[in-house]
Every structure is written in structure tokens, then in C-alpha cells.
Amino acid sequence: MPCLRRTILVLILAPTLVWPPLAATAEEAPPPLYDETLLLVDLVRDAADLVAAEGLDAACAEFRQPGSHWFQDEIYVFVFDLEGSAVCHPALPALEGQELLELRDPLGKPIIQSFLREVESGSESGWVHYLWPKPGSSTFRWKTAHVRRTTAPNGTDYIVGSGLYEMEMERFFVVEQVDDAVDLLTTAGVEEAFYTLRDPATGFRFYDAYVFVLDGDGLMLVNVGFPDLEGRNLAALQDESGKLFVQEMLAVEQGESAWIDYLWPKPGETRPSRKSSYVRRIEIDGRDYVVGAGVYFR
């Protein structure tokens, strides 16, 4: 276990963000594909069960043991209360006792607020993607945390979580991303939603995944990963193999969803990679929109 060195945390005060309600999916989200995802879910569930069975103090005493099931290298269990205070953080014990509702990553994403949002909207667990340094490092990397709400024997509720750095992208991550974007468009209004989608603090881009919005004729309205494409009609666009993938997206029926496979570069790159995008077609005020996001194959 490397020694814990000084870690730089970024605290940013930003305007209130417009958060969509947690989405009701157009199709059932695909199950986790990778073993590391399943193991993380099991770890967090077991940790939450331990808090529920033995109480916070006893559970945290176990979570803090280096080399244990709960704390191995860069993987550790953390616990927050519902007021946003860290009550157990083995990797950064200096955070314990601090109210961290305004803790934000370098993109401005409110990390603890995002944890709370996942477990306060009728779901006992959820996923949050953000930038965070590994233990002993000051370099921020993409991290995906799985969080779960649990109740200790004394009746106090807590958020228990753990995360992985630069984990494999699951298809259900982008299904949730697209569904959140659709709910935002239908509840906040198109113009306000476009502003929120482009805001890096709101999480509509993480890792290589990003949201895009086309109108029913193929005009690119929002593209978080490739903003230079906005304002262009891409209906006739082909990938490197000659596939008219935008036409396939536009062919999705109103109210339906589909997965479209094609070749497309990752953000910041020019060489095409294999990509599969999940798209939904919706109608708002008489205008059709195709909302999508995708995963790149490794």
C-alpha cells in the first residue's frame, strides 16, 4: 500500500445546476458486462449490509484496515451521511467530519450532491462518474463510484460507496446518460436543456462518452464531444466503411430506441474507432429530436 501523500482537492463554487429527474428508461438497460463492475456492486452491497448489521463505528473500523477486503490499493469504501459530511474515508481521513456538499471535481461537477441525487430519487443505489485522484497521487483521473443507501441499527441513514478508476465503459452507463438527457429536454425546455447538456459540470460527458442531439432532418444541434459539428446537417454523413450511420439514427421510429454500430473517432482523436451508440427519438412541441450517446469498443 503506497503511503498517502498530499492530495490536491478542488473546491469550486458554481451557479445552481439544472438536474433532470432520474430517468424512466425507454428500454430496459443492458446488464453489466464486465466482471469488475459486478465485483464493485457486490463490494458496495456487502459494505452497506455491514453498516446495517453492525453500525457505523464497527463497520468503519473494518473499512479502514489496509489490505482487507474493503481497502486494497486504490479501492476503498467510503461513507457519507445525508447532510453530505464524510463519516468514513480511509484513503483521505482528513476529510472525515467535513461537510462536503460543495466539493466539486475539476470540471465543476458536485460530487457529493451527485451521490445524494442517486439515492434520494426512489432508488437505493446508483452510479456517479467524476474526476478524482488515486490514493497517494495528485493527478485527477476518471473514476466511477457505485453508491448505496443503507440504515444503521440506530436508524441513521448513510451513503456507502466505492469506485474504480478508468473502468471499462458499460452500455447501461450511456443508456442512463441518454435517458437523463431526454428527461432534461422534456422537463426543462429545449434551450435550457441544450445549455445544461454542454455544461461539463452536469456529467453529460464522461470518459469517452458524450451526449449528442440531432433534429429529425439530421441537423446536429448539440454535440458535447465534437462541438464543431453543431449547426451542420449530417444526414448524408458516412463512416470510414461507407455506412450511413446518421441515416440509421434518423430511421428510428418516434418513441423508440436503438443501438447503432459504426466507426467514429474518440474525442481528441482523428483515427476512427468502433463505436456503438444508443439513440432515442422523441418529439417536443411538434419537432423531432434524436438523442444519443455511445461506447467505444476496446
Language-model region placement:
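Bacterial N-terminal signal peptides
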Residues: 8-20
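N-terminal membrane-sensor/transducer module of prokaryotic signaling receptors
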Residues: 24-298
